[in-house]
């Protein structure tokens, strides 16, 4: 199989959707679908550039990568949300007869989406790149995602943040991700200058910060 679309399992997706909370404005099932759409382009580019990729690993990883996000992972015995999602993936994939080696690769790829994780294999890089693809989306989508993540964060911590405070936090987080180059296709790495991905992320972030500096608390989140 040479594309994500060729291997999508809509019956499985309907089951996995139940592991996502529709109440979350960002980490809902649509986010998983969006990352799979991004992976379609990423893996196609890999093939164009002679980079071999296991599409099934990428597909399963992205399908499950934020499953159970609304649950209290620590109370369930998992150090991170990614570890819980990976466990849910392993259980379900084993139930439907997916081989052990594929499951191990899926678990590793899901764990590689953690902020501080390393990403070494092509599949891990593709999954992390797809998960972060929204950073390089159009500015309207990027800004909407930023606002939705603010809502989620406030719900989780039980406190409200001003928009400038949130933008400051987002700036630090995104710059951290920005510092970690995803050495995959030419879209993500350019030996002769800034890659198209990094340029798009930088421009989105600079505009977000500039707007926040200009308008402060009065900025509209919708």
Where are these regions (language model features)?
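Mid-sequence acidic-hydrophobic segments that form the walls
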Residues: 42, 70, 88-96, 109-116
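Divalent metal-dependent phosphate-bond-processing catalytic cores, especially two-metal-ion Mg2+/Mn2+ enzymes
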Residues: 25-52, 64, 115-222
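An active-site-proximal "capping" alpha-helix that borders the catalytic cofactor pocket
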Residues: 35-39, 79-96
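Short alpha-helical scaffolding segments that buttress acidic/His motifs in well-ordered protein cores
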Residues: 11, 15-16, 58-64, 106-114, ...
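Acidic/histidine metal-binding catalytic segments
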Residues: 49-57, 96-113, 123
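Acidic/His-rich, divalent-metal-binding segments that scaffold phosphate/diphosphate chemistry
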Residues: 1-71
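Metal-dependent catalytic cores of enzymes that make or break cyclic nucleotides
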Residues: 73-79
